[in-house]
UniProtKB/Swiss-Prot annotation:
Belongs to the UPF0173 family. Pfam families: Lactamase_B_2. It comes from Staphylococcus aureus (strain bovine RF122 / ET3-1). PANTHER family: UPF0173 METAL-DEPENDENT HYDROLASE MJ1163, UPF0173 METAL-DEPENDENT HYDROLASE MJ1163-RELATED. SUPFAM superfamilies: Metallo-hydrolase/oxidoreductase. CDD domains: metallo-hydrolase-like_MBL-fold (cd06262). This is UPF0173 metal-dependent hydrolase SAB1566c.
């Protein structure tokens, strides 16, 4: 299995001969190394509806025929308003099996909406974190979130091999809370900081996060770099 980071919160997972992308913010992402014209993907998984996560989902889904996995509200919105054919709606606490592995939606403390061209925001359900089980490994993508103690319950129920955690502050946890979440609650084998340096408001030094973490290994990935099992 291979997990690649592509700026902001975009993660590309390759496992069981399938390709999965999380939060495909590609075209307008100054940190993303991917090309929307050449990305190949079988599944798209969304944590919430903000532009830097919802990103290129419509174009990518229509171009590739990928199944989009997201909140029930996002699935309905993509199907009804954008004509995306393959959608799979879920909600917090639910788990579903796919041919690459399983997806479970867990809690995240954030917000979730998409703003139309007319400036009107559309509610797209609760924000979520994602627990993947693929090839015998557990990957926890926290999504955009603040610190919450039930991260420990999530990790107790699903001991985490790799955790993708935001460190950007302002909109999500900063380095202090993110490192506390890793050290005290999640305790993964590998931590990967995400959701930083894309915009001025979330500029951070990931080395400070690495220095603050005292459990497992911290992998600071540049866009295009990966962790492989």
């Amino acid at each position: 299995m291979k997990l690649s980071f592509h700026g902001q919160s975009t993660i590309y997972l390759e496992g069981n001969n399938k390709k999965v992308i999380v939060d495909p913010f590609i075209s307008n992402n100054p940190k993303c190394d991917l090309n929307i014209e050449t990305v190949q993907v079988d599944y798209i998984v969304l944590t919430h509806g903000h532009f830097d996560h919802f990103g290129d989902v419509v174009e990518l889904a229509k171009k590739t025929g990928a199944t989009v996995i997201g909140s029930a509200e996002m699935a309905d919105y993509l199907s009804s308003y954008h004509g995306v054919e393959n959608v799979h709606g879920m909600n917090i606490g639910g788990k579903a099996n796919f041919d690459f592995g399983s997806v479970k939606f867990v809690q995240a403390f954030h917000s979730s909406s998409f703003t139309h061209e007319n400036g009107i925001p559309v509610y797209l359900g609760m924000p979520i974190g994602i627990v993947f089980e693929v090839e015998g490994k557990t990957i926890y993508h926290t999504g955009d979130t603040g610190l919450f103690s039930d991260m420990s319950l999530i990790a107790k129920r699903h001991p985490v091999d790799v955790c993708f955690v935001p460190i950007g502050d302002n909109f999500t946890m900063g380095i202090d809370d993110a490192s506390y979440a890793i050290n005290e609650f999640i305790k993964p084998k590998i931590s990967v900081p995400i959701h930083y340096d894309t915009f001025p408001l979330i500029e951070q030094d990931p080395q400070q996060f690495k220095d603050a973490v005292n459990v497992g290994d911290v992998q600071i990935l540049k866009p295009g770099e990966s962790v492989q099992f």
